[in-house]
Amino acid sequence: FYGKHYDRVYITSLFTFYYNQTVKTIKSYEKLISPEKIFIGGIMVSLMKEKIKEDIDDRISILTGLLTDSSILGLGDSVNIDIRPLDYSILDDIVYKYPAGDNYFAYISRGCTNKCSFCAVPILEPEFCMTNNIVQQVKTIGEEFGEKKNLLLLDNNILSFSENELEQIVSDIESLGFDKKTKFYKELPLKQFMRKLHRYESDTIASKNVLEETLLYLKEKKKIKKSKIYQEKYLEIMGKIECSEDKLQVLFENENELIEILDFYHRPVGSRRAVDFNQGMDARQLTDEKMRILSRIPIEPFRLAFDSIKYKSIYSDALKIAAKYGVSSFSNYILYNCDDKPEELWERLKVNVDLAKELKVKIFSFPMKYAPINRTDRKFVGKFWNKKYLKNIYAILNVTKGIVADGESFFFKAFGRNVEEFYVILSMPKEFVTYRNYFEENGLAAEWRDKFLQLSIEEKNELLQVLSEKRTTQNSRLSELLG
């Protein structure tokens, strides 16, 4: 960046708890370029516009909400940037291979009909409306960046559409090859590589990364043997490339021959495609008819939100409707540390264990810790929670990579056989949770548990305060538990 001329610098922002890091980034660019050339936007900036104005140069342009008109950037047109396809080429600027890179990222709607107090969507996208033509999005991405195997949709609440609207959406998705019969056949990788190399300017980071990946791929294919003519020709071309100082130019000169040779050996195996409504579905709006429509496309996993125990019956009914139409893989988001009590988290996870067993389906839960959208850190502690409980929930989830599987034995081991056991686990030393097997085998966990259960309610509450606030205690029984 240093020593180069830039007309503008655009800085995006993510979550509000990254506030300090974002401001630090903005200030670092203030030192390198005139503030008039800096534009900031994104989620955090949209939610905290007034606050961030106090912390940065007032000459910086602050853009909030959706970018639906390019004229606000001072450009000479009025393009709705928000509906433009994503730029997949940025994935080539890094060596890391993004796990979801083989997905069409798209959305059909913005906004949500619900106005949940814990959610930022009503502020960021205040109106629920259909915005994008899914067919055009997918075709444009395919033409510019190559075909993708799966479809990942980022709609906040797809079930807010009427049955007629949902019917049209599903028909469009089917027309793109995302039905339960059509298989995906991956094109020859060299064609993808060459398309990228032609698009990028030479000597860019992306060009260098793709060239390196292409050469590695071609090197692996040197073992081809079926056709002696093709084998000899391939090795001849590879020799030219490997000996040349301008490997990219030699690659371009022999592109057609290389593709012809590798196409001869290319035998792609058809694989199932998947549609993922990644933001989850609203169980309150899932009807039998809407599920019948959705069942025509290969949704995997089927994501349902379970934000409160008060929706237990609604959630269970929705999951049963989906299972009736053949869905066997479920995933859900479970909000905690909001208005809920710890036992309500246990109860919701237990509901999933029971439903998985009853319906013979797979349900993977993702507990999501609530963080208020007006805070700049992740230190919020819910009314019925404390720091100790939250640390131990994190310890449990850290062992499982954030996923709670539906197996009964696993669930009882991690979260306890009942609410009482769950509270004991939440109160344990963090090491006892993280290294559960070790401390159970040497008997220390059982010893600690016995002593904890002998405490009065008042003593248990004091212990949790001591652990949460890192203070001392004069109670000898508590000191014994604290080690």
Give a label for each model feature.
Residues 140-331, 336:
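Conserved SAM/AdoMet-binding glycine-rich loop
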